[in-house]
Swiss-Prot record:
The lineage of its organism: Eukaryota, Metazoa, Chordata, Craniata, Vertebrata. This is Steroid transmembrane transporter SLC22A24. It comes from the Eukaryota. Keywords: Cell membrane, Ion transport, Lipid metabolism, Lipid transport, Membrane, Steroid metabolism, Transmembrane, Transmembrane helix, Transport. PANTHER family: SOLUTE CARRIER FAMILY 22 MEMBER (PTHR24064). It holds the Pfam family Sugar_tr. The keyword Transport applies. It comes from Rattus norvegicus.
Length: 551
């Protein structure tokens, strides 16, 4: 017997689970968008240097009063290679000769230019204000925008490292509550951050709390749900994240001031703290941490909410201890992560799966947090990403069942890479093709992550599955954290980051060929099962060679 037998006695999917699931779904709808919020709050609008003759309203000049804005811009700002005004330099002196006022003057030497020493003028047609316009994160300081995203993703990485340990020590409910409070306070404070350094510090704390909330809220509902409903619950949770992205796109379209949008996405999180007082702690965690009496109390409460009668007669302390005997013994001997690397076949699987997860998240995060570089229709693209999330996961589930896990993963990662690479060959004027390819890449990346998770779960043995998935998850979080830094390479070439984002999944798809297929295969229960499978495959190859050798 196991804890799932107790779940069966109190109701597999009753009123209690539905209410808890609704709470978790709302959490994901409100929390997930904070990862991609900087697509709008940190968007980089069109900009140019501030020049006195054009932007100083008090300045009076006989020539400037009769010239159009385009003419004034022409004599003040040099043109780049695309014949557009330079974003980071201006003429030291107005170049009146460029207007050919005398009709005969020709410039012999290139006019002297200088950086934007007086600041910048920003286009407000799309965004009234962003963090970029507030702290002038353009030109020489543009890399700080990527650094801010890196700091947030590093927070998620730290949260992934801390979340599991804190959850095992203090419980799922406590960590979810603390995470919601921290996220609500930090993200609300972000809107009033006086300096860029404070802004980055608050976003770092947001990353930690966001990771803890998502991990532990999902864990909380899964530990109260029967295994046969867990796949459905996870699908709903992924879909909730997609709904959150659509919500963000709609709000960002209506709210063009970054501080107002920040508050619109942060203040509602405070209201999630109200229902946390009625959340039930995981009975499984309570029992395993030597709190069987409290665990029993939670089980009886859940049975009552689900309408199970006479639960006090069926559920006793002795029944709970007997049912959880095996899990209590397993909890006393927690395997070290080093166990994963002591045997050759398991070590190979862990290394390959970690590489695939890391690369998948580098490209996926690169797509999600850099929408502005993919299309001018950033609001529409954000909504499309959210909309395609659910059908993409359904497609992935169908493909894994009929084509196999490995084949599905190879196809999805290859298509994702090709989609990203194709965008680099399209000009900014080709908005519809760029929008289609970006949406396709986003959809496939979501399905690819799902298939990666399934493959990882089925390739590691039960006895150390939690430890193995934790190690693989750490490598994935590291990839997500590194992803924003690749955008710094745009200072050398505008296409270079996207070429890397596209090439990495294609290379990773080749690595998947080294992993075994798991469709319709029994899950390995022990490390010996993994190693025996390797030996048996070798014996099969030897037998095949022996049979063909005589011929």
């Amino acid at each position: 017997m196991a804890f799932q037998d107790l779940i069966t006695q109190i109701g597999c999917l009753g009123r209690f689970q539905i209410l808890h699931l609704i709470f978790v779904l709302i959490c994901f709808i409100l929390v997930v968008p904070h990862t991609v919020l900087e697509n709008f709050t940190a968007a980089i609008p069109s900009h140019r240097c501030w020049v006195p003759i054009l932007d100083n309203n008090t300045m009076s000049d006989n020539n400037s009063r009769i010239l159009s804005q385009d003419d004034l811009l022409r004599i003040s700002i040099p043109m780049d290679s695309n014949l557009r005004p330079e974003k980071c330099r201006r003429y030291i002196q107005p170049q009146w000769d460029l207007l050919h006022l005398n009709g005969t003057f020709s410039t012999v030497t290139e006019p002297d230019t200088e950086p934007c020493v007086d600041g910048w003028v920003y286009d407000q047609s799309t965004f009234l204000s962003t963090t970029v316009t507030q702290w002038d994160l353009v030109c020489g300081s543009q890399t700080l925008n990527s650094v801010a995203k890196f700091i947030y993703m590093t927070g998620i990485f730290i949260g992934h490292l801390m979340g599991g340990h804190l959850s095992d020590k203090f419980g799922r409910k406590f960590i979810v509550t603390c995470g919601l409070l921290t996220l609500a306070v930090t993200e609300t404070s972000v809107a009033f951050a006086p300096t860029f350094l404070i802004y980055c510090s608050l976003r770092f704390l947001t990353g930690i709390s966001s990771s803890c909330i998502r991990t532990n809220s999902a864990l909380l509902i899964l530990e109260w749900t029967s295994p046969k409903f867990q796949a459905m619950v996870m699908a709903l949770i992924f879909s909730a994240g997609g709904i959150g992205q659509v919500l963000l796109g709609v709000l960002a379209f209506g709210i063009r001031n970054w501080q107002h949008l920040q508050l619109a996405m942060s203040v509602p999180v405070f209201f999630l703290l109200i229902p946390t007082r009625w959340l039930s702690e995981s009975a499984r965690w309570l029992i395993i941490t030597n709190k069987p009496q409290e665990g029993l109390k939670e089980l009886i409460k859940v049975a009552h909410i689900n309408g199970i009668k006479n639960s006090r007669d069926v559920l006793t302390l002795e029944v709970v201890k007997t049912t959880m005997k095996d899990e209590l013994e397993a909890a006393e001997t927690k395997p070290s992560p080093l166990v994963l690397f002591r045997t050759p076949n398991l070590r190979k699987r862990i290394c390959l799966l970690s590489f695939v997860r890391c690369v998948s998240l580098i490209s996926t995060v690169g797509l999600l947090i850099n929408l502005q570089y993919l299309s001018n229709k950033v609001f529409l693209l954000q909504c499309l990403y959210g909309v395609v999330c659910t059908p993409a996961n359904l497609l992935g589930n169908f493909s894994m069942n009929y084509m196999g896990r490995r084949t599905t993963q190879i196809i999805f990662m290859s298509v994702m890479g090709i989609s990203i690479l194709s965008i680099t060959f399209l000009t900014q004027e080709m908005q519809i093709p760029r929008l289609v390819l970006a949406s396709l890449g986003g959809a496939i990346s979501s399905a690819s992550l799902t298939s990666t998770a399934v493959l990882s779960n089925e390739l590691v043995p039960t006895v150390i599955r939690a430890t193995a998935l934790g190690v693989i998850g750490i490598f994935g979080s590291a990839g997500a954290a590194l992803s924003p830094l690749l955008m710094i390479l745009m200072t050398y070439s505008a296409s270079l980051p996207w070429i890397i984002y596209g090439v990495l999944p294609i290379l990773s798809s080749l690595v998947v060929l080294l992993l075994p297929e798991t469709r319709n295969q029994p899950l390995p229960d022990s490390i010996q099962d993994v190693e025996n499978k390797r030996k048996s495959s070798r014996e099969v190859k030897k037998d095949a060679v022996a049979k063909v050798t005589p011929f």
